[in-house]
Amino acid sequence: WERAPLLKGKTILVTGSASGIGLETARLCTAMGAKVLGVDVTKRFDHVEEFYRADLTDGATIDALIDVLPKGIDGIANIAGLPPTAPADKVLAVNLFGLKHLTLGLLPKLNDGASIVNLASLAGFGWSDAIPAILASEGVHVDDATRFAAEHQITNAGGRSYFFSKEALIAWTMQNRWTWRDRG
């Protein structure tokens, strides 16, 4: 990275930091001068300053993560995600419900002016066609992903669990884009 370190002195939390887009995001943030707090269910990645192992399908694990993470976070990069080949309830838990649980729990630990980036996909482009299920998903706890998937017949057929997780994430992100703006 040849530019000035744009993130120098910033603390960025990156979920999914051990592989794929999360790994590359952590590397880029580190190269840009950030202190990276990596979160993943698997292994530690060398380009993070601190690593936290957490399973984003489990509410108690997420709560424990929130408890141990430091205050003073300048950004959250919600990158962790499962593909449509994973069980539908796990896809919903990681890609949507766990992400929301973690993000909302971390709000008191964010610095004023902090940024939140939620990685979605073109798979979520049809979110407006899924509004009834999206509205039904609003208060669902991460530990209730299996029940929600069954009640709303969200399965892996045609990648539906993945598509829905991204549709609902886009809607939630748009819904909350102004929610915390008074913090800068």
Predicted regions and their residues:
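Rossmann-fold cofactor-recognition segment
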Residues: 46-60
